[in-house]
């Protein structure tokens, strides 16, 4: 109903006339170009047939049949059961339907059709007139894309020149409505003149004076528009040529001329002679005749115009029936200004040249051109509808219709020129079995023309034979999605009887609810829309029964196969497919199968699958739907993949559908737990003895990147808790104290914690070491870390919770043995040396002493050079060791901890942190005169105890400290050497200082200026870690250039590598409190020498830059008693006395030590790594920032002025020339004795 309301402009206009209650007329109005199946009208509703049925008491079902010629393509169709009128697939084009006709009004374009209503008891003949309204389906067009106009240059302003008008096949408001001059110039304008016939002619107006010499051509665009919706338009190029002057224009004698010419006029017949005059002379008076642009192309084809004479002639045969009136516009132009215009109307008169036409349309369907009637059929049985027509007009078009000979049939007039063929009397089969007669149609022209149509009628006998179907099994095929009332086939049966006995009635059997069968004709139609997906085949029976008495019948099987159409899109079994695969699935493994169905058949159900979204991670088999992976899955990187799958069938056009696919990657337990806390396997937690049971003493925390149970972690202590002192929460990882610590529990406890996930079928685990130090305080951090390092060599299954004390006792025993052995060796060496010295002759000693005394008092450069030459010739001892402290210790068998036996190389930051930590105690004053020569002092310390004192409350280190300090002759004095790696000095400087790492603990009180190492971090709160300085293996304290002190002596101590702690902790006592306001220095009193005197070094052992070498002597200069000479003695011993070289056994040179790093800790960039333990277990070392280490190593505790050297802060200087006791700034006691290290 909506479509009808939309397209149908007017429903039922009128019921024009009823003739004998059987002829009625309906008028409908529709738009052209309607699509198929648009309802036009409803015959029973519009005629109110249901009321008529009720009045007459008729209850039989009515059949509506469109009466049409065989082979015609109907523009409309009529439902046989409902009487509804619909459009067909044949497009109704108003311009084509009414081509060549001139209509004053839009509604004059129409077509007619007839519909009969059966059965005969309620016969109706319905004449339907359908008026076709115009739609704007054509754009107006100019006759040519380029329009040329010539205008004289002397044309006056506002002169008008006609422009060929555009044509539009549409009519009314859909036709040409408006002209517009585009990109026109101000020289011209445009005006529209409307003719009495309603045509619109454009005219070009000259708005400015023209000058051909300045510009002879103007090119513009002209646009034409119609008034339809949507509006259509077109454009053309308008080219104006300015021509030379021509004063007078041609003039027609008659502007409007009307002529008549018969339609049978031969070719060449003159229609009219036009004549125009021109007042000019010569060439300006030459007139040329042309057709105007408004002349239709069909008219130009029928008539010819002589361009010179103006004669119009017939050039093709005329047909009044096609076009009765031709309007011709003729222009007369002399090539100058506006041409003259004349309109010629040519009326084509009719002649009787067309015979009548008979349109015979059967009401009773003929069989092979023959109408079968029963001999008992009543009178006035309607056989056919006959329509006669003649294309001629007036008398020539008046037609009469009659039957040629006497037969029991007659024609009954229904409308003008329309008749019904009926039986005029009862039929007698026994009298005549068959009738064949002609229907004649004749016009009234002179001479008269006629037309005939042959009608065959056969009568049927009594019923003695049953009807027989032509085919016992009728097989049909029909496409699904058909329309209701679709004609399928005509089921026919024959009966050898005649008359009533041969009148066959068809009836459907059971299981035929989808079909309608015409009882009379056997026309089988579809009463419903078929759906092949619901039912593909219908099998039912059709019964043909005659009207005999008794009636006879027969049956035929009808098999209707429904053909498939692609009306079903592929359907996925799920709108969203979800597949679950395990991670680490190999590449090209099957992930899942996409299932899709299509209810169609054949190619329409051939489904092809494809992946959308350009997903390259998966491969989809387009036919089987198997999804295979193109990658290996890793759930930790991506847990799911989502893409769309498209299914396309093979129909035309193809149909498709999509579904969503999600690939969920199931977790596989392929990741071990990762320890977050503790940050490393070498950190520790302090457990005070006052801790109460149940308190948390440490926290173990780990994460697992897997999910589900694979990420659920369980914490257990697998080793190190044999006493049951600690308990770990299996869920949180918190380590709590089970019972209050006893004194026997004091020490380092190593707990091996196993962190395992709950993965199935295989659980993964990680081991981590948790060190708990049970004590009231953790004052000596280096001691604790040394214990931790020792435990790294211990198998994980061994308990070391109380192993610190045995290590300590063992170290004390080792130290004592080493001290006793060292003392015995020194005593033996001294004894042997004394014996060797005593062998020298007294005479040789006296002479040498006299000579050396002279040089002592007044040394000269020449003697020094000579002695240097002698010293070069003589093999001097190469075994003298540089002044250094050697610390030997054993490290774990680790890639990071290598055995260390070498000299400590301190970076700049360690120097800054270490120097100034300790006071050296009172410095003895020098006893040498100013500018006196400096005797080399030889040191040999083989004391069984270290050369420095430990505070009583300092715990003894578990390391084995073996300290040996040697000062050979050539390395006694420290000069301003730039390269510290030389480990020797070439000149004297003002001050002697020494420093060590955690093992030495030496510190000066004044600020020192040290070299900087760029690789060190300057952060105060970061533990000092070893970094490589590019050019130094030791440390060196620079000289204060502005020092006002007198010449002094500097002694530099080179310590072997081995400290693993920064200088924040001496390693020999308690650590300094963090944030202490004042620096706590540990005085390091030097051990008094065994005797008051010392031996002087020979002058030839000194370097050129040597100065005073005895800042500590307090007695007058003079030789001491000479001991017995040894084989190592020289002549200098007679004067100066014996030196250490006389009795010193050969040793390692100062450079013959292995180079080792300062610390066994890995650099910061290597702090996260795996360490292998003794038993093969792997520990995760994640050195971040250990709170314990930071507690002991915070650089802030050293004061803000550390590491800077300026004029305002001086080092402690000891004048060499002052013979009095020197008192340090710290107020230490005086000491005139020599301090021996």
Curated annotation (Swiss-Prot):
Positions bearing carbohydrate: 48, 148, 306-307, 347, 368, 450, 511, 630, 681, 734, 754, 775, 780
Location of this chain's protein in the cell: Cell membrane
Sequence ranges of Basic residues compositional bias: 866-877
Start and end residues of each Cadherin domain: 26-142, 143-252, 253-358, 365-469, 470-572, 573-675, 679-784
GO terms, molecular function: calcium ion binding
Protein keywords: Calcium, Cell adhesion, Cell membrane, Glycoprotein, Membrane, Repeat, Signal, Transmembrane, Transmembrane helix
Annotated region described as Disordered, given as residue ranges: 849-882, 984-1035, 1055-1084, 1097-1122, 1186-1237
UniProt biased composition (Basic and acidic residues): 1186-1197
TM segment ranges: 815-835
Polar residues: compositionally biased ranges: 984-1001, 1011-1035, 1198-1210
Extracellular-facing ranges: 24-814
GO cellular component: cell-cell contact zone; glutamatergic synapse; growth cone; plasma membrane; synaptic membrane
Superkingdom of the organism of origin: Eukaryota
InterPro entries tied to this protein: Cadherin-like_dom, Cadherin-like_sf, Cadherin_CS, Cadherin_N, Protocadherin, Protocadherin/Cadherin-CA
Biological process terms in GO annotation: cell adhesion; forebrain development; homophilic cell adhesion via plasma membrane adhesion molecules
Lipid bilayer topology: Single-pass type I membrane protein
Protein role: Potential calcium-dependent cell-adhesion protein.
Record's protein name: Protocadherin-9
Gene: PCDH9
